[in-house]
């Protein structure tokens, strides 16, 4: 085929994809990347962080990005990597937990909430972890009293806890402050999955925070061992750009495997070949937007979230919980049926597992007119 014919054929396939800016994607935690990412992607498209000695500049950028992420998570000594996404980040954290537990001759018993991302189910299967599921509170967060009692019971040997800061379905945040105290007092590891919340909570204005709700989640809490944070969600980086950060580089030895034929003789990430595009794009976008830019981005998303909730209630819909961040769960006893009917009209929402509700993620690509159009379609769908 000629080059132009190839491109024309590819455009036909691409035209079948949904576009973020059209406003029909309401259930994804990803969004249209910042425009500067196009230029950066072209500059770094051939780089491979799997062999960092060949790409010294890109490798240095990764260290800078980890430092920048560490800074917004209150840790100037953070160690980690920019990887494929939240799934790989969570798998990496669980792999470290497993290897640390083995080194201490402890059982691999880990407390993980029902609201956790499905990547932890993959980790359980791959690593043969024994998972304890604590009950949830009315706010869909883990019952801290149950966890404390369970951990302190001498019969239950727990090696780690997973807390969620912005759960995939509802946006709820576990009480990481109390979980951190339990982790410190009992010498156990605590991983925080802030794949979504990591680029929301640090920039969230107090006026959007729920009263009586604890938003603390990062390395400012002494018990936090590791954090998942994804730049390709609210960070506006292109896919794939996920992040895993550990408190310090003492965790590296629990991840390293020998890689004698590479320029560096050990490798810690699950995926070997890693494009530098995610690293470079994250660096550029974070430098361009800065703290103020992300604050504006989050505040705009929260204003749209408030609008969605207000309009939904005018139509007679109720939320499963008051939104903790820019994720809304609208109660629906026939969620799967409603979801499929909406899809027939080209609206793509998702459903919650832990509650009978539709799930809408108010990402930056959504505009007020998209939200209003969706709610009108939802209302019409429920009439029939």
Swiss-Prot record:
PROSITE patterns: DDC_GAD_HDC_YDC
Gene transcribed to yield this protein: mfnA
Function comment: Catalyzes the decarboxylation of L-tyrosine to produce tyramine for methanofuran biosynthesis. Can also catalyze the decarboxylation of L-aspartate to produce beta-alanine for coenzyme A (CoA) biosynthesis.
Alphabetical UniProt keywords: Decarboxylase, Lyase, Pyridoxal phosphate
Cofactor: pyridoxal 5'-phosphate
Regions annotated as coiled coil: none
Domain of life the protein comes from: Archaea
Pathway per the UniProt entry: Cofactor biosynthesis; methanofuran biosynthesis; Cofactor biosynthesis; coenzyme A biosynthesis
EC number: 4.1.1.11, 4.1.1.25
Name of the protein this chain belongs to: Probable L-tyrosine/L-aspartate decarboxylase
Modified residue annotations for N6-(pyridoxal phosphate)lysine: 233
Pfam families xrefs: Pyridoxal_deC
Family of the protein in this entry: Belongs to the group II decarboxylase family. MfnA subfamily.
GO MF annotation list: aspartate 1-decarboxylase activity; pyridoxal phosphate binding; tyrosine decarboxylase activity
Catalytic activity: L-tyrosine + H(+) = tyramine + CO2; L-aspartate + H(+) = beta-alanine + CO2
Keyword Ion transport set for record: no
Example of a GO biological process term: coenzyme A biosynthetic process
EC class name: lyase
């Amino acid at each position: 085929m000629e080059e132009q014919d190839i491109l024309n054929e590819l455009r036909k396939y691409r035209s079948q994809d949904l576009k973020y800016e059209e406003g029909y994607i309401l259930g994804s935690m990803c969004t249209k990347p910042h425009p500067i990412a196009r230029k950066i992607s072209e500059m770094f498209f051939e780089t491979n962080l799997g062999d960092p000695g060949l790409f010294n500049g890109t490798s240095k950028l990764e260290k800078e990005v980890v430092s920048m992420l560490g800074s917004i998570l209150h840790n100037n000594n953070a160690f980690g990597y920019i990887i494929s996404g939240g799934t790989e980040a969570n798998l990496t954290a669980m792999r470290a937990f497993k290897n640390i537990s083995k080194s201490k001759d402890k059982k691999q018993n880990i407390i993980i909430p029902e609201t956790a991302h499905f990547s932890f189910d993959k980790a359980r299967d791959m690593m043969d972890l024994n998972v304890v599921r604590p009950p949830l509170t009315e706010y869909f967060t883990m019952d801290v009293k149950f966890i404390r009692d369970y951990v302190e019971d001498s019969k239950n040997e727990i090696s780690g806890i997973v807390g969620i800061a912005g759960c995939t379905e509802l946006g709820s945040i576990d009480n990481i402050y109390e979980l951190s105290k339990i982790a410190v007092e009992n010498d156990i590891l605590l991983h925080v999955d802030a794949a979504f919340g990591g680029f929301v909570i640090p920039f969230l204005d107090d006026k959007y925070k729920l009263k009586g709700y604890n938003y603390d989640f990062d390395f400012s809490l002494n018990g936090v061992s590791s954090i998942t944070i994804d730049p390709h969600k609210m960070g506006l980086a292109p896919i794939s750009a996920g992040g895993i950060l550990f408190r310090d580089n003492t965790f590296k030895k629990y991840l390293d495997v020998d890689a004698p034929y590479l320029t560096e003789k050990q490798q810690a990430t699950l995926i070997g070949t890693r494009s530098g595009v995610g690293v470079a794009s994250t660096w550029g976008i974070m430098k361009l937007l800065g703290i103020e830019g992300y604050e504006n981005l989050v505040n705009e998303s929260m204003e749209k979230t408030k609008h969605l909730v207000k309009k939904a209630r005018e139509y007679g819909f109720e939320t499963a919980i008051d939104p903790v961040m820019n994720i809304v769960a609208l109660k629906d006893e026939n969620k799967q049926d409603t979801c499929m009917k909406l899809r027939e009209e080209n609206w793509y929402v998702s459903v919650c597992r832990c509650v009978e509700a539709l799930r809408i993620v108010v990402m930056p690509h959504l505009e007020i007119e998209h939200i209003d159009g969706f709610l009108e379609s939802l209302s019409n769908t429920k009439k029939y």
